[in-house]
Regions:
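Conserved acidic
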Residues: 1-186
Length: 186
C-alpha cells in the first residue's frame, strides 16, 4: 500500500527534522487518500464506466457502521476506565474519531500539570496506544459479527495531538496541533 509507505517516510523524515521531505511525503500520502476516496465515490456515479450502486452503497454503509462501532467501543473503553457513562468521543468524521485523553490522564495522575505539553504528549501517546490497540482488537469481532469475514483491513491509528480545538459545523473545525504522527509541531 503506497499510502502506508508514504506515511512511514513522512514520520521518519519528520523525526529526523527534514522538513522538506516530511512535507513532500505528507502531500504524497494525502494524494493517495484523495484518489482512493474518489474511487469509492465515483462507483456511485452512473456515468462512471465501472458504475456499481451496490458496491458504492456497501462501501458507504460499511464505513458508517464501522465509525459508529468505533465511537461506541471507544466510549465503552473510557466508561470502563473512568467508571462513568459519559460520551467521551467529541466528534466523528468519515474515517476518524476525536477524543480527549485528559479525563484518563487526570484520573491516573491527579496532581499532574495538564498545561505541561511535554508531559501531556507523553501520556496522551500512552493512552492513545492503549485505546488504539483495544479498538483494533475489537475490529476482529466487528468483522466476524457484522461482515461474516475473518480477514479485514480495518486499522485505526492515533494521528494528531491537539492542545485545543473548536468545531463550527460538520467537517469545519480547527485544531492547535502540537504533535502529528509522532512528530512535534510548532
Amino acid at each position: 500500500d503506497e499510502r502506508v509507505e508514504y506515511k512511514k517516510l513522512m514520520k521518519q523524515f519528520g523525526n529526523e527534522g527534514n522538513t522538506e521531505k516530511y512535507e513532500y511525503f505528507k502531500k504524497r500520502q494525502l494524494v493517495q487518500k484523495i484518489l482512493l476516496n474518489s474511487m469509492y465515490g465515483v462507483l456511485g456515479s452512473p456515468t462512471f464506466r465501472f458504475y456499481d450502486v451496490d458496491n458504492a452503497e456497501a462501501t458507504t454503509l460499511t464505513g458508517q457502521m464501522l465509525i459508529k462501532y468505533t465511537q461506541k467501543t471507544c466510549n465503552e473503553y473510557y466508561n470502563n476506565e473512568l467508571k462513568d457513562d459519559s460520551d467521551h468521543v467529541i466528534y466523528t468524521d468519515t474515517d476518524s474519531i476525536f477524543v480527549s485523553s485528559v479525563p484518563i490522564i487526570k484520573k491516573r495522575f491527579p496532581n499532574a500539570n495538564i498545561e505541561d505539553d511535554s508531559f501531556m504528549t507523553d501520556k496522551i501517546l500512552i493512552v492513545a496506544k492503549e485505546v488504539q490497540d483495544h479498538l483494533n482488537q475489537k475490529y476482529n469481532e466487528f468483522a466476524k459479527l457484522y461482515l461474516n469475514c475473518d480477514k479485514h483491513r480495518f486499522d485505526i491509528k492515533q494521528e494528531v495531538i491537539a492542545k485545543s480545538a473548536f468545531w463550527v459545523a460538520k467537517k469545519r473545525y480547527g485544531q492547535w496541533i502540537i504533535n502529528e504522527n509522532g512528530v512535534t509541531c510548532d
